[in-house]
């Protein structure tokens, strides 16, 4: 508590009491006069403590690849109070400054900042070249490396190949993007695999602190191995992107009489067409299960075509010859009764029955 003193006017008694005024009514010395009390208020103290705690618990995160997806994630990371530094092949200094991040055009300068976490937001195709040329020796040996690629076995293998053994590895996949997650991340899947996290309590806590960012945003947190992720993703994400691009090539357009199902198709095209073909190619090239899914899609499409044309062929035969359209088995039996050509399976069955009777 601070005491401020200032001169004060002497206390003047009424005229009839001035002579007999007691000594205790005399004004205090000017040097001891209290003018104001400057004390910190409770809410100011709590705000200060909260600010200091937030700074102490903040992570310094280096984002490699500050393109569309990197900027999308960075806005949320900064909103959670973390310190962001970025690097990319292109100059994104203006974009970084606009959200409160710092941009470094040289990866050596970025590593000199000693980030707690290095977050790879590069494309699938450029990931290996980025890791191969990255100056790991300038980082602390306990640095946590995180990727957000749409395939998981591929970056896991690259991390193990190129990263020093002292570094921690966390493979993640936020299964949403700037379009599907532009309003909220609530309920959207976030898949992660703690590939290599040190036993030290500080390293365990750092990993959990990073994951809590997405948990606090309401993401559906799914811990899953990289191998299992790629198996499921080939049947969901790759198929989704494939159908979206097929419908885009087909040219679906909105109409005045859209059904709910058709609106879903339009949304699918919108969500997938905004992603680069490089991403789609990466989903195909670097997921070992993607080719099988593409072949299954092709077989399913051919099966539907055959079913449609088969039904059309039956209707055509009915119009041409009249009467009930017979199934293939009934047709074979009719040919037998009419003395037509006998199928080979019927010949073999009849011969076997005759031999048994003899």
UniProtKB/Swiss-Prot annotation:
Family membership noted in the UniProt record = Belongs to the prephenate/arogenate dehydrogenase family.
Spell out the GO cellular component terms annotated for this protein, sorted alphabetically and separated by semicolons.
Answer: chloroplast
A single GO molecular function term of this UniProt record: prephenate dehydrogenase (NADP+) activity
Q: Between which residues do disulfide bridges form?
A: none
Pathway(s) this gene product operates in, as recorded in its UniProt entry: Amino-acid biosynthesis; L-tyrosine biosynthesis; L-tyrosine from L-arogenate (NADP(+) route): step 1/1
Task: Give expression by tissue.
Answer: Expressed in roots, stems, leaves, flowers, siliques and seeds. More abundant in seeds.
In residue numbers, the region (Disordered) covers: 336-358
- The organelle transit peptide extends over 1-36
- What is this protein's expression induced by? Strongly inhibited by tyrosine.
Origin organism lineage: Eukaryota, Viridiplantae, Streptophyta, Embryophyta, Tracheophyta
Localization, per the record, is:
Plastid, Chloroplast
Residue ranges spanning the membrane: these are none
Biased composition annotated in UniProt, kind: Low complexity = 348-358
Q: Briefly, what is this protein's role?
A: Involved in the biosynthesis of tyrosine. Has a weak prephenate dehydrogenase activity.
Judged by the first EC level, this protein's enzyme class is oxidoreductase
State the organism of origin.
Arabidopsis thaliana
Q: Where is the Prephenate/arogenate dehydrogenase domain?
A: 59-338
Q: What is its EC number?
A: 1.3.1.78
Catalysed conversion reaction: L-arogenate + NADP(+) = L-tyrosine + CO2 + NADPH
GO biological process assignments: tyrosine biosynthetic process
Further remark: Unlike TYRAAT1, TYRAAT2 is composed of a single catalytically active domain.
Keywords per UniProt: Amino-acid biosynthesis, Aromatic amino acid biosynthesis, Chloroplast, NADP, Oxidoreductase, Plastid, Transit peptide, Tyrosine biosynthesis
Checking InterPro entries in the record gives:
6-PGluconate_DH-like_C_sf (IPR008927), Arogenate_DH_2 (IPR012070), NAD(P)-bd_dom_sf (IPR036291), PDH_N (IPR046826), Prephen_DH (IPR003099), TYRAAT1/2 (IPR045011)
Q: Which gene encodes it?
A: TYRAAT2
Q: Would you tell me the protein name for this molecule?
A: Arogenate dehydrogenase 2, chloroplastic
The record's section on Gene3D superfamilies has:
NAD(P)-binding Rossmann-like Domain
- Origin: domain of life: Eukaryota
């Amino acid at each position: 508590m601070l005491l401020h003193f200032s001169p004060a006017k002497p206390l003047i008694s009424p005229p009839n009491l001035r002579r007999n005024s007691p000594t205790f009514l005399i004004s205090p010395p000017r040097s001891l006069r209290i003018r104001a009390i400057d004390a910190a208020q409770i809410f100011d103290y709590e705000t200060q403590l909260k600010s200091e705690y937030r700074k102490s618990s903040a992570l310094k995160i280096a984002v490699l690849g500050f393109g569309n997806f990197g900027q999308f994630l960075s806005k949320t990371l900064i909103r959670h109070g973390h310190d962001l530094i970025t690097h990319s092949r292109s100059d994104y200094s203006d974009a970084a400054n606009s959200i409160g991040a710092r941009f470094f055009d040289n990866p050596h300068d970025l590593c000199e900042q000693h980030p707690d976490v290095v977050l790879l937001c590069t494309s699938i195709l450029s990931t290996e070249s980025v890791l191969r040329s990255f100056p790991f020796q300038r980082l602390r040996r306990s640095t946590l490396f995180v990727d957000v690629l749409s395939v998981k076995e591929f970056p896991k293998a690259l991390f193990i190949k190129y990263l020093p053994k002292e570094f921690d590895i966390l493979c993640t996949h936020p299964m949403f993007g700037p379009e599907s997650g532009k309003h909220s991340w609530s309920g959207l899947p976030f898949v992660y695999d703690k590939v290599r996290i040190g036993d030290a309590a500080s390293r365990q806590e750092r990993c959990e602190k990073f994951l809590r960012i997405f948990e606090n945003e309401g993401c559906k947190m799914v811990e899953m191995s990289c191998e299992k992720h790629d198996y499921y993703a080939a049947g969901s994400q790759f198929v989704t992107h494939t159908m979206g691009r097929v419908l885009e090539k087909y040219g679906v357009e909105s109409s005045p009489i859209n059904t709910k199902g058709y609106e879903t198709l339009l949304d699918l095209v919108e969500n997938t067409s905004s992603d680069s073909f490089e991403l789609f190619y990466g989903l195909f090239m670097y997921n070992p299960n993607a080719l099988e899914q593409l072949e299954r899609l092709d077989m399913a499409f051919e099966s539907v075509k055959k079913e449609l044309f088969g039904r059309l062929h039956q209707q055509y035969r009915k119009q041409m010859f009249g009467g009930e359209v017979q199934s293939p088995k009934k047709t074979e039996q009719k040919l037998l009764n009419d003395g037509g050509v006998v199928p080979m399976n019927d010949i073999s069955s009849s011969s076997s029955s005759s031999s048994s009777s003899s």
